[in-house]
Amino acid sequence: MTIYLFGVSNVGKTTTGELLAEKLGYVFYDLDDEVKRYYDMTLEEFVNTGRLEERDKKRSAVLRKIAEDTREKVVAVAPITYINYMNGLVRQKDVLAIELRDTPENIFDRLVFSDENDVIYRDDEYKYAHMSYYMNDIKEDIQHYGRVWSELVKNKFDMQGEAPSAVVDRLIDEFELDRDFSEEGAAWNGRK
């Protein structure tokens, strides 16, 4: 099975995905890390090259490479607007696509930054000084990607501001991820 975790930036896809993969004994991929490795550049360089559609096409090419790995896996998917490049990946048999959601306030609390070398750091003083800007940006992302993913990703999961371990436990329960679907030939195809 392949589990794709969608969501806006800073919702917690990577942390949740790593923990979920560990708990299930799956391989974990973070699309941002794979893009950096595949194109041999920092994320800062990547997001400043070409147009958004070109970058989404490149991200989708990396997702197709990840999909070639036949092991069970969890994939944290960076926000992609041009989903037509990845439609076929999500609609395959044995694929579960989940959009992780949370309130703008909870996402703001998780907000981190990265420098030009992709080193992640917290800067709460800066974050709170520009709270209005970031809250508006988060709200716009939630609205935009909610529309973009509405047809592609049928499973919506409210994180409720919980700790990542609690989110993982609820994901496992809600989607029965501890159940063996191999004999049933589960066809999640983006829905429970």
Segments from the language model and where they lie:
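Hydrophobic anchor at the beta1->P-loop junction of P-loop NTPases
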Residues: L5
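P-loop (Walker A) phosphate-binding loop of NTP-binding proteins
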Residues: V8
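ATP-binding Walker
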Residues: V11
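Walker A/P-loop
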Residues: T14
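NTP-dependent small-molecule kinase module
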Residues: L19, K23, L96, Q143-K192
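Conserved substrate/cofactor phosphate-moiety recognition/catalytic segment
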Residues: E22-R64
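Glycine-rich phosphate-binding loop used to anchor ATP phosphates in small-molecule kinases
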Residues: E54-L96, L100
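A glycine- and Lys/Arg-enriched "phosphate-lid" helix/loop adjacent to the NTP-binding pocket
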Residues: D94-Y145
